[in-house]
Amino acid sequence: MTVKLTIDCMGGDHGPSVTVPAAVKFVRAHPDAHLMLVGIESAIRAQLKKLKALDDPALTIVPATEVVAMDDPVEVALRKKKDSSMRVALNHVKEGAAQACISAGNTGALMAVSRYVLKTLPGIERPAIAFALPNPTGYTMMLDLGANVDCEPQHLLQFAEMGHALVAALEGKERPTIGLLNIGEEVIKGNETIKRAGELLRASTLNFRGNVEGNDIYKGTVDVIVCDGFVGNVALKTSEGLAQMLSDIIREEFGRSLMSKLMALLALPVLMRFKKRVDHRQYNGAALLGLKSLVIKSHGSADAYAFEWAIKRGYDAVKNGVLERLARAMADNSVSLGEGEHNAGGAGHASPAAGHHAEPSAAQSSKA
């Protein structure tokens, strides 16, 4: 089976100078992949020519006349730039020409345009960015990592349901454990949104283990950690910064003297394994969960190596039938929001009827 993906070549801080080289390298390593490079044709051609890939049959240029800038308001991306590389790439997925879209573009714009073009799964009000973060025994699924900076309690319940379904689909776990990210384990901790979300989660049929703290993220305390996009994005980027700092400190310490350099040579295999494990670029690419089609969000600051990993996330998701498995798991393990809210004493608000998809408000998301 040929895996067909659309690449928003103009998205991110670096645009085609990063996205096109990553795409070229990816198809050369994956002969069953076909990538549609969406964006300003002249800019894409210039990069392909430089890489001697203009005639590569695994790459197709799809012209788009507009670009969603990283600082564009959501309204501009959604209502004015209807021929942007982001929108055209998503339209190709909607029309069935591709199976997934990969973009490093403005997070808020990508969330809003994806939601408008592709629609959400039944019962899901807002998509969320989900990613598997490493822990000592495997990984912890965490969401939201930046799609929704302000959330209501029922949104956090929906994120938990999606995380539950994704882990159930990928790992075969019947009852994945769920934790709510908070400033303490006690029920009384947190703001009103977190407290009400905790009530909804305790009243649901999910395997909710209560509040977890930031130091639980990489311990593997629970299978799924739920938070709003503001907190999740800060936690993720703090982790990446810490990993980079540790690598820099080790490099600096081993370079201080001739003796330390000799010790570094002896420890080189261990150091290389350490460097690989903490290189956040290989963890680039997170799924925008809750949509009817696959969308992978790359960091806007990604280099070509990191963006290639984001492409691989989309490729692997298609090959493994993640979307279909997620939809089945959500149907099998669905949580009734109305019942949960009733049992929680009315905390939260009723979600809108499934199938109603007006153009989203800019207040629901932001650039990340």
Swiss-Prot record:
Gene Ontology cellular component annotations, sorted alphabetically: cytoplasm
EC number: 2.3.1.274
A single BP term in Gene Ontology: phospholipid biosynthetic process
Reaction equation(s) it catalyzes: a fatty acyl-[ACP] + phosphate = an acyl phosphate + holo-[ACP]
Subcellular location: Cytoplasm
UniProt pathway: Lipid metabolism; phospholipid metabolism
Protein keywords: Cytoplasm, Lipid biosynthesis, Lipid metabolism, Phospholipid biosynthesis, Phospholipid metabolism, Transferase
One Gene Ontology term of the molecular function aspect: phosphate:acyl-[acyl carrier protein] acyltransferase activity
Highest rank taxon of the organism: Bacteria
Pfam families: FA_synthesis
The protein's enzyme class: transferase
Compositionally biased residues, Low complexity: 349-368
Span list, region Disordered: 337-368
Main localization category: cytoplasm
InterPro entries reported in the protein's UniProt record: FA_synthesis (IPR003664), Phospholipid_synth_PlsX-like (IPR012281)
Function of the protein: Catalyzes the reversible formation of acyl-phosphate (acyl-PO(4)) from acyl-[acyl-carrier-protein] (acyl-ACP). This enzyme utilizes acyl-ACP as fatty acyl donor, but not acyl-CoA.
Family: Belongs to the PlsX family.
Subunit structure: Homodimer. Probably interacts with PlsY.
Name the UniProt record assigns to this protein: Phosphate acyltransferase
Organism: Burkholderia lata (strain ATCC 17760 / DSM 23089 / LMG 22485 / NCIMB 9086 / R18194 / 383)
